[in-house]
Regions:
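Short, linear, compositionally biased motifs with a strong N-terminal bias
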Residues: 14-17
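N-terminal signal peptide c-region/cleavage motif recognized by signal peptidases
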Residues: 20-21
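Boundary at the C-terminal end of the N-terminal hydrophobic targeting segment
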Residues: 24-26
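Flexible, solvent-exposed loop/hinge segments and secondary-structure transition points
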Residues: 28-284
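Bacterial N-terminal signal peptides that target proteins for export
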Residues: 2-11
Length: 284
């Protein structure tokens, strides 16, 4: 009789263990719902990136905007890097337009991240500043001289590997603050359709003037250009300003204080038309 009771208890214990094991395998941890049960192959956008496009969306838009070997954006017609950061300066996505990470200047990966961080860091809910707008103010004697040294790049996050992941969905920069301040064209603040400032975009890989043109078109393609206003004296937005002339002593002077040099490869004519050809404001 004792043996029979012992066998029954053992069987019951094994059954309970089997049920528990099955439940653990079948159910997600408490408080954590399964990711995209209707699309199990689609990764969930992390919380820090919820207000911004996915890496795939950034990549697709970048490839459409970059005109390799052409003159749609001025400059040399090179491949480009693009990086987005959220409002806290955390990198949410990195992409490149070429077929491999070596098809565009390797150094421009971190520069694009710097630009994204700068545009986000020095823009406000009611005032957008592009990195191009900062050029004149940071020159010796300018009102923001030294700004470019104020927030250094976090080199540990910027350069950790493996390099094969650079520009991919799992780029080592993603999820980290890169820091850095860049003061030439290519960085723009991102405003959603409701006018909320949600982060910054940085583009690098050609002349700084072309970088700005590509960034403007890319921001427009992502529908994140509902800009509230800026310092451009003509268009009243964050478009690049070309008003630098030489004074009697041969020193460059910006009439507005927000000027950027003309790179001289057709970029200026394109930039002047950006507010008309790619107007700011939400796309329905």
């Amino acid at each position: 009789m004792y043996r029979g009771i012992h066998l029954l208890r053992t069987a019951a214990a094994l059954a309970a263990l089997a049920f528990t094991s099955t439940s653990i395998l079948a159910d997600p941890p408490a408080g954590k719902p399964p990711e995209h049960p209707e699309h199990p192959d689609k990764p969930k956008q992390p919380e820090f990136a919820k207000d911004l496009p996915t890496q795939a969306q950034l990549l697709d838009a970048l490839k459409k905007v970059v005109d390799v070997g052409g003159d749609d954006n001025g400059g040399f017609g090179l491949n480009m890097w693009a990086t987005m950061v959220n409002r806290d300066g955390i990198v949410t996505a990195v992409a490149f337009s070429g077929n491999d990470r070596g098809d565009q200047w390797p150094g421009s990966r971190v520069i694009s991240a710097q630009k994204a961080n700068t545009a986000n860091s020095f823009s406000l809910p009611k005032l957008a500043l592009s990195t191009a707008n900062l050029y004149s103010a940071v020159q010796p004697g300018g009102t923001l001289f030294g700004l470019q040294h104020s927030n250094p790049v976090d080199t540990e996050n910027a350069y950790k590997g493996p390099s094969s992941n650079y520009g991919q969905n799992n780029d080592p920069l993603v999820g980290h603050k890169v820091g850095g301040v860049n003061v030439f064209g290519g960085g723009l603040a991102l405003y959603n359709k409701d006018g909320k400032l949600v982060g910054g975009l940085g583009v690098s890989g050609d002349t700084s003037c072309t970088d700005h043109n590509v960034a403007w078109k890319l921001r427009h393609a992502l529908n994140l250009d509902n800009v509230p206003g800026g310092v451009n004296p003509v268009s009243k937005d964050d478009n690049i300003v070309y008003d630098i002339t030489l004074d009697v002593q041969g020193h460059p002077v910006s009439a507005s204080g927000w000027g950027h040099p003309d790179c001289g490869l057709g970029e200026k004519a394109i930039a002047v038309k950006l507010p008309t050809d790619f107007p700011i404001g939400p796309t329905p």
